[in-house]
UniProtKB/Swiss-Prot annotation:
Principal EC category: hydrolase
Source organism of the structure: Rattus norvegicus (Rat)
pH-activity note: Optimum pH is 7.2. Active from pH 6.0 to 9.0.
Keyword rRNA processing: no
EC number(s) per entry: 3.1.21.-
Record GO biological process: apoptotic DNA fragmentation; DNA catabolic process; neutrophil activation involved in immune response; programmed cell death involved in cell development; regulation of acute inflammatory response; regulation of neutrophil mediated cytotoxicity
Disulfide bonds: C199-C236
Tissue specificity remark: Detected at high levels in spleen, lymph nodes, thymus and liver. Observed also in kidney and testis, but not in brain or heart.
Post-translational modification (record): Seems to be synthesized as an inactive precursor protein and converted into an active mature enzyme by removal of the N-terminal precursor peptide during apoptosis. Poly-ADP-ribosylated by PARP1. ADP-ribosylation negatively regulates enzymatic activity during apoptosis.
Motif (Bipartite nuclear localization signal): 40-56
Protein name per its UniProtKB record: Deoxyribonuclease gamma
CDD domains tied to this protein: DNase1 (cd10282)
Length: 310
């Protein structure tokens, strides 16, 4: 009996499975929304784009929130959930206002409640002997549960560095990892944010002093060759995503990590894009527990090269 007549059906089935795989995956994003305060809140065009970007993601880290009145996230919840007749609703968890002086920022995580929930959270205390107060804005560490993904839970450590101290701050994330492991029985880690990890802020010779890079157990999804900046005049991989933990590394959807160029996607001029931010979001996907559970195409710690893109 010939198998040829069945080949169109098999091809269609494979395409369906691939589409289902993508639909069931969990998209995680990180976005520095430059100076996200009252003035940007009143820019309706910029806000429309920001909401579109958030809606692409199942969980998104927002940085550089400058909101002394705590209005930004409630406003976003209204835009995301207020007129929605769908069953999908967003929730959020936000840090306190962080910074050494009068200049303060907040980290916020927005997430789809049906897919993700918060298990625990804490603000990292930057008090190690000999290097007290390394972070300009201490990581707001959140442990998430995601019951429908292959990795059922993961810790996200966000970071927005000061450019001049990027090398030291990125290196210090290794100490944050150790601190979280002491507190929680967590195995899956995501470090992400605006690390300012490119161009003159982190020159090539500095990487040897960053434990997050020299330790091969930390897997970098956004490589040094990427450009996460909006301006055409710059090309720097400031924004990064780094994983730790075999389970979560193996759960990454192949070729899902990268930079989301919202300027191109939404056909904006450079000026219009800069009204939104001077950074592009970075992202990746985690496989669903129901999709390709036996796949051997996931990212491998052994095969992953430092600084390479998945």
């Amino acid at each position: 009996m010939s198998l040829y007549p069945a080949s169109p059906y098999l091809a269609s089935l494979l395409l369906f499975i691939l589409a289902l795989h993508g639909a069931l995956s969990l998209r995680l994003c990180s976005f520095n929304v430059r100076s996200f305060g009252e003035s940007k809140k009143e820019n309706h065009n910029a806000m429309d784009i920001i909401v579109k970007i958030i809606k692409r993601c199942d969980l998104i880290l927002l940085m550089e929130i400058k909101d002394s009145n705590n209005n930004i996230c409630p406003m976003l919840m209204e835009k995301l959930n207020g007129n929605s007749r769908r069953s999908t609703t967003y929730n959020y968890v936000i840090s306190s206002r962080l910074g050494r002086n009068t200049y303060k920022e907040q980290y916020a995580f927005l997430y789809k409640e049906k897919l993700v929930s918060v298990k625990a959270k804490y603000l990292y205390h930057d008090y190690q002997d000999g290097d007290t107060d390394v972070f300009s804005r201490e990581p707001f560490v959140v442990w998430f549960q995601a019951p429908f993904t292959a990795a059922k839970d993961f810790v996200i450590v966000p970071l927005h560095t000061t450019p001049e101290t990027s090398v030291k701050e990125i290196d210090e994330l290794a100490d944050v990892y150790t601190d979280v492991r002491r507190r929680w029985k967590a195995e899956n880690f995501i470090f992400m944010g605006d690390f300012n990890a490119g161009c003159s802020y982190v020159p090539k010779k500095a990487w040897k002093n960053i434990r997050l890079r020299t330790d091969p157990n930390f897997v970098w999804l956004i490589g040094d060759q990427e450009d996460t900046t909006v301006k055409k005049s710059t090309s720097c991989a400031y924004d990064r995503i780094v994983l730790r933990g075999q389970e979560i590394v193996n759960s990454v959807v192949p070729r899902s990590s990268g930079v989301f160029d919202f300027q191109k996607a939404y056909e904006l001029s450079e000026e219009e894009a800069l009204d939104v931010s001077d950074h592009f979001p970075v992202e990746f996907k985690l496989q669903s527990s129901r999709a390709f559970t036996n796949s051997r195409k996931s990212v491998s710690l052994k095969k992953k090269k430092k600084g390479s893109r998945s």
